[in-house]
Amino acid sequence: MAFKVVISDKEKSVQMEVDPSESRGLIGLTIGDEFDGSIIGLSGYKLKITGGSDKNGFPMKKTVPGARRIRSLVSGGVGYKPRRDGERRRKTFRGNTISDDIVQINTVVIEKGEKPLEELLGADEE
């Protein structure tokens, strides 16, 4: 399955779709891991995984190990904003490991390459 990778930089965020053949290098990585951008066609860039969501829209959570899906009682943080003080709710989260069920991966640029992102992804945005 193809991944949608959101790449955030200080100036701008861009989204690109990664082919299934290229995305094999991302399977098994967890939130907080850094990887070389050449895996997804961004040579010279170094990216850090900050989150994502699965095929049903459930967010990945750093504190949930593995690629499983759980229902957790939360009072704030990732995936839930309480309306009143002390309010808690049971929410579904995806684990912190990238698997075939993940659709969107959020990343942030750690090291920039020689070419700007817009130049590398120019053909994809048109």
Swiss-Prot record:
Listed GO MF terms: structural constituent of ribosome
Give the GO cellular component terms, alphabetically: ribonucleoprotein complex; ribosome
Record key words, sorted: Ribonucleoprotein, Ribosomal protein
What the entry lists under Pfam families is as follows: Ribosomal_S6e (PF01092)
Which residues are listed as membrane-spanning?
Answer: none
Determine the domain of life of the protein's source.
Answer: Archaea
**SMART domains per the UniProt record, alphabetical:** Ribosomal_S6e
Keyword Ribosomal protein assigned: yes
Q: Which InterPro entries match?
A: Ribosomal_eS6, Ribosomal_eS6_arc, Ribosomal_eS6_CS
Q: Its GO biological process terms? A: translation
HAMAP family referenced in this protein's UniProt entry, alphabetically = Ribosomal_eS6 (MF_00512)
UniProt similarity note: Belongs to the eukaryotic ribosomal protein eS6 family.
Question: Which NCBIfam families does UniProt cross-reference here?
Answer: PRK04290.1-3 (NF003294)
Name listed for the protein in its UniProt record: Small ribosomal subunit protein eS6
Question: What is the species of this protein?
Answer: Methanothermobacter thermautotrophicus (strain ATCC 29096 / DSM 1053 / JCM 10044 / NBRC 100330 / Delta H) (Methanobacterium thermoautotrophicum)
- Write the lineage as a comma-separated list: Archaea, Methanobacteriati, Methanobacteriota, Methanomada group, Methanobacteria
